[in-house]
Swiss-Prot record:
It comes from the Eukaryota. Residues 33-44, 571-581 have a biased composition (Basic and acidic residues). It is a single-pass membrane protein. It comes from Xenopus tropicalis. Belongs to the AAA ATPase family. This is ATPase family AAA domain-containing protein 3. It is found in: Mitochondrion inner membrane; Mitochondrion matrix, Mitochondrion nucleoid. One of its GO terms (molecular function) is ATP hydrolysis activity. InterPro entries: AAA+_ATPase (IPR003593), ATAD3_N (IPR021911), ATPase_AAA_core (IPR003959), P-loop_NTPase (IPR027417). Residues 1-242 are mitochondrial intermembrane. Residues 51-213 form a coiled coil.
Length: 594
């Protein structure tokens, strides 16, 4: 509306309104349009009332006192419209720019797709060309291989032909040479035969002369040798001094050989009895010359060691401890007074301290000890008798007295009436009975067995005292647990030299609890528990033995002990079943005293 109030004079006229028609052309215009393009027809329906109302409203607005405000309002509206138009133009321009950018992006995308497609086409073309090249190369290799094979075949055929020709040539040459050789040999044989026929009388004469000369030479040699030997023997016989000296020399030579042979045997047996160790002896406190040279410090300590307590390190029940202490005191006094030693039988379950007490008894009494096992006797066969005599001969040479400890004695000291014993073992048993028939002041016999009822009756007759080693009770088990816990755990941990530490818990209470849990276990099984605790600590990551690890090892040991007991019960049932099928008179026929 600004043009209506005379504003924006420098601008163009009002814009054309689409709803209003164009003004009529002047009458002098061209009449090409005909009658239907006349102004009369075009403006015949025009209504000017609208323009009149607009003009009237403009006059009223000019005359109004609010004309200035209306003018300002119109200006503001015009500016607002212009700003809206400019914003629309900017939006249009932004849309155009966006469209251009979109077109550029689309073109770039199309170009990228085109490049990708071209790249794919190039790659496909390159792959196809490479495939063709590979095929051509493979075909060339195949052709070359076929050609090489053909050349090789031809070469082989040529070589075979040459070899055949060479072989034929050599065969022909050998055949010709053979023919020539046969002809030469035939000619030589004919010539030799002709010469021999012509010289037959001369050859026979030469042979006759050579034989006569050889016979004459042999006869002269025999005559000369007989004359020499005859004169020498005659001269020897005629000189009685030479005859006497010769006989004496031969006699002395025979006596020297016999004496040296027997003296060597006697000296060897003496050295073996004094210095050697019998093959049946597994362990002994007596030392040989070789051991003294090899371990001088150990032997010196043993010689300078003081007499130990017989029950040091041995944990037994009070009643049994009192009895074995009496045995130790009696044995020591017997040695001091040079009396006769008493033979002892110790029986009981395995691992109850029989072997340990035997060693302690020997040390307490100031005696030497020797340990042999019954299982070593049976495999020796016929050598068992000799080996048994060597053991007792060796025992009799001890100046300090010898405690001979036979572990698992029931392995060879069985009843002689049973059919299971062999003749060699029976002879060895008889030798043992012969050497132990009387009391001795040289050695003390200590037998250990888990099944003393299998002993021959003569063995029982040679036993002076029987000691039963039973499984440890609650108090003894607690002492054993404390002993081995201190030996295998606390002492290595306190020394600090080994990778072993102990966690903080009540050791005394734990040992008491373990003693209650280990009911029925032997001392050896409890000692193995101590070793198991030490091994568990070494196997841990930090080397610390805690209470849980101890309980785990104890539970495992209890489970193993129960399994062993089940096996023992099953074995007892089998033996009972076998015993029930025996002859009821068999016990009356077994063994008689010797």
């Amino acid at each position: 509306m600004s043009w209506l109030f005379g504003l924006n004079k420098g601008q163009q006229g009002p814009p054309s309104v689409p709803g209003f028609p164009e003004p009529p052309s002047p009458p002098g215009g061209s009449g090409d349009g005909g009658d239907k393009n006349k102004p009369k027809d075009k403006w015949s329906n025009f209504d000017p009332t609208g323009l009149e109302r607009a003009a009237k409203a403009a006059r009223e607005l000019d005359q109004s006192r609010h004309a200035k405000e209306a003018l300002n309002l119109a200006k503001v509206q015009e500016e607002t419209l212009q700003l809206e138009q400019q914003s629309k133009i900017k939006e249009y321009e932004a849309a155009v720019e966006q469209l251009k950018n979109e077109q550029i992006r689309v073109q770039a995308e199309e170009r990228r797709k085109t490049l990708n497609e071209e790249t794919k086409q190039h790659q496909a073309r390159a792959q196809y060309q490479d495939k063709l090249a590979r095929q051509r190369y493979e075909d060339q290799l195949r052709q070359q291989q076929l050609q090489n094979e053909e050349n090789l075949r031809r070469q082989e055929e040529s070589v075979q032909k040459q070899e055949a020709m060479r072989k034929a040539t050599v065969e022909h040459e050998m055949e010709l040479r053979h023919k020539n050789e046969m002809l030469r040999i035939e000619a030589e044989a004919r010539a030799r035969a002709k010469v021999e026929r012509e010289n037959a009388d001369i050859i026979r004469e030469n042979i006759r002369l050579k034989a006569a000369e050889h016979r004459q030479t042999v006869l002269e040699s025999i005559k000369t040798a007989g004359t020499v030997f005859g004169e020498g023997f005659r001269a020897f016989i005629s000189d009685w001094d030479k005859v006497t000296a010769t006989v004496a020399g031969l006699s002395l030579l025979a006596v020297g050989i016999y004496t040296a042979k027997n003296a060597t045997g006697v000296a060897g047996r003496y050295i073996e009895a004094r210095l050697g160790k019998p093959s049946l002896v597994r362990d002994t406190s007596r030392f040989t010359v070789a051991e003294a040279v090899k371990h001088p410090v150990k032997i010196s300590k043993r010689l300078l060691s003081k007499i130990q307590d017989a029950l040091e390190g041995v944990i037994l029940s009070p009643k049994l401890e009192e009895r074995v202490r009496d045995i130790a005191i009696a044995t020591r006094n017997t040695k001091a007074n040079k009396g006769l030693y008493r033979n002892i039988l110790m029986y009981g379950p395995p691992g109850t301290g029989k072997t340990l007490f035997a060693k302690k008894l020997a040390m307490h009494s100031g005696m030497d000890y020797a340990i042999m096992t019954g299982g070593d006797v049976a495999p020796m066969g016929r050598e068992g008798v000799t080996a048994m005599h060597k053991v007792f001969d060796w025992a009799g040479t001890s100046k300090r007295g010898l405690l001979l400890f036979v572990d698992e004695a029931d392995a060879f000291l069985r009843k002689r009436s049973t059919e299971k014993i062999s003749e060699d073992l029976r002879a060895t048993l008889n030798a043992f009975l012969y050497r132990t028939g009387e009391q001795s002041n040289k050695f003390m016999l200590v037998l250990a067995s888990n099944q003393p009822e299998q002993f021959d009756w003569a063995i029982n007759d040679r036993i002076d005292e029987i000691v039963h080693f039973d499984l440890p009770g609650l108090e003894e088990r607690e002492r054993l647990v404390r002993l081995y816990f201190d030996k295998y755990v606390l002492q290595p941990a306190s020394e600090g030299k080994q990778r072993l530490k102990v966690a903080q818990f009540d050791y005394g209470k734990k040992c008491s609890d373990l003693a209650q849990l280990t009911e029925g276990m032997s001392g050896r099984e409890i000692s193995k528990l101590g070793v198991a605790w030490q091994a568990a600590a070494y196997a841990s990551e930090d080397g610390i033995l805690n209470e849980a690890m101890i309980d785990a090892r104890v539970a495992d040991a209890i489970r193993q002990h129960q399994q062993k007991m089940e096996w023992l019960k099953a074995e007892g049932k089998e033996n009972a079943a076998k015993e029930s099928g025996k002859n009821p008179l068999q016990p009356l026929l077994e063994g008689t005293p010797v």
